[in-house]
Swiss-Prot record:
GO biological process, one term: translation
Name listed for the protein in its UniProt record: Glutamyl-tRNA(Gln) amidotransferase subunit A
Residue ranges of the TM segments: none
Organism (species): Sulfurihydrogenibium sp. (strain YO3AOP1)
Quaternary assembly: Heterotrimer of A, B and C subunits.
Keyword Protein biosynthesis: yes
Gene encoding the protein: gatA
C-alpha cells in the first residue's frame, strides 16, 4: 500500500479503523519528500523530525481515544505566511528570514485541536505577491508536472507538495487567486472561502480586505474535511463572521439536479485559449448530463477587475508592510547613520523587487493628489463588481469559468513583464473583490499539463460549490493522476 498516494480522507479512514498508525503515514510522506523535494523545492522549512516526533505521540494517544477526530495524526503542510509558534515563518522574504512567531494563527490552533501533524512551511512569492512563486527570496518552486514550469503563485509551494505527493493536503492564502491559480497549474483542488468564513488572525497581511486562508487537497473530500475544522467565527478577527458552519463533508453527496450554472460571457471571449475553452465547456456538459442547467450570464464590470485589484491590493499592502522597518522584529540593516537611513536601508535590503513595486504603486495611489482618482475610484468599481455577482446569483446557483487563461508557463517566461504576470490572475481576482467563495478543480489536460475549472458560489455557500465539485470529481479520475517527478 503506497500511503503517499492516498487522499487525506482515505488516510483519515485508515487511522480511524486503526489499520495504519500516524507514524507510518508520516514516514511514508517523508520518504516521498526525500525523493522529489530536491527537484521541486516546495518547502522553505521541512520539519521531518518534528513531524515524526508528533506522529509517534499520536500513535500512543490513538490507543486511548474513543472519538478520533477527522484530521488526527494526519500530515498537513502550511504556507509560510501563516504564523506557527516556535517555527520560523519567513513569508519567503529576507525581511523575515529568521522570524519565529510567539503565537499560532487561529487556523493552526484549530488544526492542533484535531491532532494534526505539520510537515513543514511551504514556499511562496514574497509576502504572497506574485503568480508564479518565482518571487520567493530563497528559490523558485517547480511544477511537479514539468520541472521547467512554474507551480503558480503565490501559494506555489502548498500546491506543489500536494500535487507531488509530499503531503496529502496543505493550507494556502488567496488575495487575488493565490490558492486557485496554483491549484489549477498543479492539478489539485484548492478553495478560497468567502471573506470572513475563516479567521485571518496570524496570517501575515498583504491586502486585508481581500486575503483569505483556504485548503488544498487531492480530492474535494479533503478540502471539505479541512474546511470543517478551520471555518467559523474567531473573536481575534473582527472580519470573521458568526454565520453557522455546515458539515461540508457530510453534505457532499447532496443531489445537484436542478442547480443552475452561470457562464459569464466576459470570461469566454476570443482571447481565451480555444483548447482551455473546450475543456471547460466539456466539463459543464458532464454536469448538464447530471441534471444541472447552464445559462449565459453577464458580469460586465469584471473586465475592470485586474486594474481595480492592482490599485486596491498594493494600497493595502503599502500600509500593511509599513510595520517592517527594522525597529521591532525582522531584518535590520547593518550600517546606517541615523533612524531615517535605518528605515530606508532596511526596507531596501529586506524587500524584493516585486514587493517594492507594489509598495510604490500603493503609496502613489494613496497619495494626496491621486487618492480620489485611483483608490477611491477603485473602491467604487469594486462595489460594482460585487453587485454584478449578486445580480447573477439571483438567477443562478454557481458560476463556472476557467481558473486560468492557459496552463502553467515556463519559469522566467513572464518575470520581466509584470503586466503579463498580473494577467494570469484575470479569472480569479473578481471573486476576491466580490468576497465570494471560489474553488478550482482539475478538469482535463492540455499539452500534458493540468487545466483547472473554477466554480464560484454565493457568499457563505461553500457547501454548494463543494457539492458541484464532488459530483464532477465522481465522473472523472483526474484526482487519481500523479505527475512523474
Amino acid at each position: 500500500m503506497e500511503l503517499w498516494k492516498k487522499s487525506l480522507k482515505e488516510l483519515s479512514d485508515l487511522v480511524k479503523s486503526k489499520e495504519v498508525k500516524p507514524s507510518e503515514i508520516v514516514e511514508a510522506f517523508i520518504e516521498r519528500k526525500n525523493q522529489v523535494e530536491p527537484k521541486i523545492k516546495a518547502y522553505v522549512t521541512a520539519l521531518d523530525d518534528l513531524a515524526l516526533e508528533k506522529a509517534k505521540k499520536r500513535d500512543q494517544e490513538l490507543t486511548k481515544l474513543e472519538n478520533i477526530p477527522d484530521l488526527f495524526g494526519l500530515p498537513i503542510a502550511i504556507k509560510d505566511n501563516i504564523s506557527t509558534k516556535d517555527i520560523k515563518t519567513t513569508c519567503s522574504s529576507k525581511m523575515l528570514e529568521n522570524f519565529v512567531p510567539v503565537y499560532d494563527a487561529t487556523v493552526i490552533e484549530r488544526l492542533k485541536s484535531q491532532g494534526y501533524v505539520i510537515t513543514g512551511k511551504t514556499n511562496l512569492d514574497e509576502f504572497a505577491m506574485g503568480s508564479s512563486t518565482e518571487n520567493s527570496a530563497f528559490f523558485p518552486t517547480r511544477n511537479p508536472w514539468d520541472l521547467e514550469r512554474v507551480p503558480g503563485g503565490s501559494s506555489g509551494g502548498s500546491a506543489a507538495v500536494v500535487a507531488s505527493g509530499m503531503a496529502p493536503a496543505s493550507l494556502g492564502s488567496d488575495t487575488g487567486g493565490s490558492i486557485r491559480q496554483p491549484a489549477a497549474f498543479c492539478g489539485v483542488v484548492g478553495l478560497k472561502p468567502t471573506y470572513g468564513r475563516v479567521s485571518r488572525y496570524g496570517l501575515v497581511a498583504f491586502a486585508s480586505s481581500l486575503d483569505q486562508i483556504g485548503p488544498f487537497g487531492r480530492t474535494v473530500e479533503d478540502v471539505a474535511m479541512i474546511m470543517n475544522v478551520i471555518s467559523g467565527k474567531d473573536p481575534k478577527d473582527s472580519t470573521s463572521r458568526s454565520i453557522p458552519v455546515p458539515n461540508y463533508l457530510e453534505s457532499l453527496n447532496k443531489d445537484v439536479k436542478g442547480l443552475k450554472i452561470g457562464l459569464p460571457k466576459e470570461f469566454y471571449t476570443e482571447d481565451l485559449n480555444p483548447q482551455i475553452k473546450e475543456i471547460i465547456l466539456n466539463a459543464v456538459k458532464q454536469l448538464e448530463k447530471e441534471g444541472m442547467t447552464a445559462h449565459e450570464i453577464s458580469l460586465p464590470y469584471t473586465k475592470y477587475a485586474i486594474e481595480t485589484y492592482y490599485i486596491i491590493a498594493p494600497s493595502e499592502a503599502s500600509s500593511n508592510l509599513a510595520r517592517f522597518d527594522g525597529v521591532r522584529y525582522g531584518y535590520r540593516a547593518k550600517e546606517y547613520k541615523n533612524l531615517e537611513e535605518m528605515y530606508s536601508k532596511t526596507r531596501d535590503e529586506g524587500f524584493g523587487a516585486e514587493v517594492k513595486r507594489r509598495i510604490m504603486i500603493g503609496t502613489y495611489a494613496l497619495s494626496s493628489g491621486y487618492y480620489d482618482a485611483y483608490y477611491l475610484k477603485a473602491q467604487k468599481v469594486r462595489t460594482l463588481i460585487y453587485q454584478d455577482y449578486m445580480n447573477a446569483f439571483e438567477k443562478v446557483d454557481v458560476i463556472i469559468t476557467p481558473t486560468t487563461p492557459d496552463v502553467a508557463f515556463k519559469i522566467g517566461e513572464k518575470s520581466n513583464d509584470p503586466i503579463q504576470m498580473y494577467l494570469s490572475d484575470i479569472f480569479t481576482v473578481s471573486a476576491n473583490m466580490a468576497t465570494v467563495p471560489a474553488l478550482s478543480i482539475p478538469c482535463g489536460f492540455k499539452d500534458n499539463l493540468p487545466v483547472g475549472m473554477q466554480i464560484i458560489g454565493k457568499p457563505f455557500d461553500e457547501e454548494t460549490i463543494l457539492q458541484v465539485a464532488y459530483k464532477f470529481q465522481s465522473l472523472n479520475d483526474y484526482h487519481k493522476r500523479f505527475p512523474e517527478v
